[in-house]
């Protein structure tokens, strides 16, 4: 009978537990036996068979099994053990003095397991119980930590930031409410002085961070990178500097490495010192590996390849790393940065000229995965990328990117923009406006593109978003300069010339990524100046560079613009040839929304023959 089977399971479990207590740590398969023993006990309990006098021991064993499973990144099994452990505690007295620590540990583990397993409602239930019964701030910190991650994942950045800064105040860390360039530069200067004699070896030989409050302060600061990058990126350098300063004073932990990475990012974004920023990014990677932060490595690789490596390494390399990092993050239970990695992979794959039909399938699958993982915040950016792809490959209006995302609350792009604006997600709003601008540019709607460029103005300096804003705005300006009267042409020429200057800085950082873009901007500049020989040479150089570095979409653009130039100097046959080659490249890219424009241009030439 079921009861007899349950009794058998129970007796087997008790015998193994008794054997474990006798053999202590001498048995080589002790870990496996522990899991088997507690599995037997849990099976028996599901049939109502247990021994109340041993409940505390069973709860402790389940806690041990759950924590061991989660250390091996098996969060589903871990949560099952934790739930069983809680079920063994007496309902009326589980929070009394004798079982308080055990009950608290089980609820702390349950919070984390629920978050990783995409069970936010369940996580909030455990968080509420823990906060209601915890006796001091230190006993509430793990609950607050998971609460902040839950809020971040759901996109409620306002509450996530408020709770984080409230906790940091209780931990003795305060920050200015208004950030000025002077404050940022002062903090970076102070941190630079602190790091003058820094070596990786000196950190590894330094004491570990033992002060629990300072350790938790750094942990909470490390949680801020996501929300601040969307709502208040100017705050990022201050957080990074504080993490470095606390680590230098009190000792180092795995999270300290992210302070060094943030410091490196600030060298790029504030001082435009790419070499120094890249150097600190590499140090941060190496430091985390040496400090043993295995679970944090995917997050570190994601941030490094999304914000730092693009200035020195080919996009084709970093996009592949991000795809691999997505899988790594899933394996260690970092569902937030699994989603962040996937988002940045999609974005970087696009600028590599990934086929847009393949990109559509990948983007849709990743958006669905984000919903499944309850990483709703990342859906803003992912859906925005998805819309861009659909507009470029001609499927916009045929495919609905919104049905399963945001629980049906968002039905179109305008509602997505309004939600981003109303919730204070400035970078998400900028991203939507920026993609609209770039679509108008690629579709040759230059007057509309110029208007949208103004709305999408002022993205973060030395950022991925800034680079492609400057590129498209510069080319748009040169197009409009040639179409305008002399009075307004000077305005457009100024914008175009500023883009050329900016791209000379970018190209010095990475010839692979941005040489072809610079050559195309220079070609358009020379055409506006009626310097035909120089323009032709730069067009050819742009086409060659795009071919060599495998940017098929930018090769197509350079071919088309070269064809336009040849047409203006009445080199009709060669112009037709370039248009034909451009069409082939656009087809390879999958940009079917652009191809009718090339067909029209080719038809116009044929009509004059």
Feature-to-residue mapping (PLM):
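TPR-repeat structural position
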Residues: 30, 55, 72-75, 120, ...
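Short coil/turn linkers that connect adjacent helices within long alpha-helical scaffolds
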Residues: 40, 47-52, 72, 91-97, ...
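Hydrophobic, small-residue-rich alpha-helical packing segments that form membrane-like cores
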Residues: 53, 241-251, 263-355, 361-374
